[in-house]
Amino acid sequence: MAPRIRVLAALDQARTQYYHFKAIVIAGMGLFTDSYDLFCISPVMKIFGRVYYAPSGSVDGSGSGPGVTPPAVVSATVGVALLGAVAGNVVFGALGDRVGRRRVYGACLLLMVCSSVGSGLSVCRTRRCALASLCFFRFLLGVGVGGDYPLSATIMSEFANRRTRGAFIAAVFSMQGFGILVSSAVTMAVAAAFDHYTGYPAPLDTPECADLAWRIILMAGAVPAALTYYWRMSMPETARYTALVERDVVKATNDIGRVLADLDLAAVAEEEVAAAALSPPPVTTPPPPRPSYGLFSRRFVRQHGRDLFACAAAWFLLDIPYYSSTLFQSQIYRPWFPPAAKVNAFQEAFNVAKFQAVIAVASTIPGYFAAMLLIERAGRRRLQMAGFLLMAVFLFALAGPYDGYWRDHAKTAGYIVLYSLTFFSANLGPNTTTFILPAELFPARFRSTCHGLSGAAGKLGALVGSIGFLWASQQKDGAAAGHLPGIGMMYALFVLGGICLLGLALTYAFTPETMTRSLEENESSVQAQSQVGDGGSDAGNGSDGLRFHELNVLMEAATKSPVSMASSHLSMSPILPHRMSL
């Protein structure tokens, strides 16, 4: 292996500064939009049911009572967004490695903004047309959100220093918690305003303006994302992509010097040359060909297949109980609020959003912050195992006495505490670590793609959990209207707990630890093991030759102005023949 490029070492050792926190906010907006979209849909569907499923078309067919959105429609609105997220993870993850993180980052944000606005701007007033329009734009929203997952994690991992990389990526992911909180706040504000404006209508009286309320809630999710578009587009390409994928050390150094105030270009260059002087001169000076093996090639599977399986499988197993628990909220909050027949559409949506805000403040956000504090102390692997174990314990505690006790005592503090601890454990452990690990384990040229594949597996698990749980939680002999008979809530919770134990076992067997190591060290350890198995067949001096030649250019460029630096770089056509500009 060639010695490490010093600009990347300097990036690993850089002090935490303003730009790191700015990057957290910029990168976190996609996750913010994701959780806003996921959690606002429950209260939105309450209003939607009152508007488009009037009492005469209620689910039970009695012609009385408030309109209710059928379970199949709820599943469709959730499922299309998750399917879009699967596609977005795969497509934008691959594009992030092929054309650069920055180039497709803005496209994801624009797609999220436009589809959020489109979700509420449907001009249709009939039920079928409104549903078709809503599902179409929610699919596009899912594509944008899914694409943001690998790009946000990869960009933050490549900008962060070694000491706080895990905490920074966890901070990006914690924006989901604030998305839940803002979603609840916006829903409560809109519902309260419309309720007051319409004179607090009777429970079965749904004003025509309610059709506007749910649209405003959906469109409001575009505002925070739109506000960060300028800063997202002004970000430079990550140094690791520029240096390791585009193989342009000079430009990488220049880009990082613009955003990290304490990076001394001349000092970095001097360290590079000093390190090169201590190394034996390279045998070969021409640049080597770009790495020949591709994604899913035999060599890729040998070197990275185990890690990709560990990341994708853990994320898949996590999202089944995590998204199922999100849908389980309806069972939790129902005893605490008046029945739907005694409140109007705005009040029902307000109550659902209020409960979601309580859960977010009590368990979800504290779980994210606990992960940020512990990720660099306990490590990713230990936190993931601990989180899976705690989730299983709390789900079993809910499942065991459910039929005999919890079903008739749902309005107790212990019931909500156990449910909240399930969310806390997920966010403390696997919900955060499954987002971090794929951004640390893979080489720069596969990093975004592999993160996207892992995230896509997670969204498939979410699809299984969100749709499967709606069926499985129904009683065999007493399914709710619009549902097929299932296995019952108690057995459904037991299954979710068992899935968490399976995630624990998989993490123990397959997941490596990445704490305290640079991204290049994580990659080197995998390649070294592969080279030992191959008898060192991948060793060579070609990369040393390329690096030795670039060091001289780097030393010269560090003492020049940016204009001279660009001119010097452009004259290096024999070294980087495919690069035409900075």
Curated annotation (Swiss-Prot):
It is a multi-pass membrane protein. PANTHER family: SOLUTE CARRIER FAMILY 22 MEMBER. Keywords: Membrane, Phosphate transport, Symport, Transmembrane, Transmembrane helix, Transport. It comes from Oryza sativa subsp. japonica. This is Probable inorganic phosphate transporter 1-9. Although related to the sugar transporter family, it does not transport sugars. GO terms for cellular component: membrane. Belongs to the major facilitator superfamily. Phosphate:H(+) symporter (TC 2.A.1.9) family. One of its GO terms (molecular function) is symporter activity.
